[in-house]
Amino acid sequence: KLDTNGSFPDRLKALAEAKLVDFVAMDIKNSLEKYEKTAGAPVDLQKIRKSAAFLMNGGAEYEFRTTVVKELHRGEDMVRIGQWLKGAKRYFLQNFKDSEFVLRKGLSPCSDAEMQSFKRLLLPYIPNTLIRGEQG
């Protein structure tokens, strides 16, 4: 399994084509419009798009996942993510968990109701949208 933020699509492709990875979990920080703000650093969005497209076009078994943060994610972001990744095989929402290792202080998790609302917004675009840790 390879965990990636998608910043190196050429490496991702080389690893997948060489059959060195059997599964890829790619972090999707936010909608493309808010990607850099959420990542907290400059991001080459073309590389992120290229990695996502490679996976969606059958490059490897994969899932996309977003760690949802109350202060950084809104409903319209979920719709934009859904439009961007429409038809993705699997998409997980993961609620933020605060810890001493978090790079930014003052962030908080969403309520269960907010997580369910985000899931409902994504389902029309990505039918296999799940909340990590949710039963059933």
Report the location of each language-model feature.
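A C-terminal junction/extension of Radical SAM enzymes
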Residues: Q116-G136
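Conserved AdoMet/S-adenosylmethionine-binding subsite of the radical SAM
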Residues: K1-D112
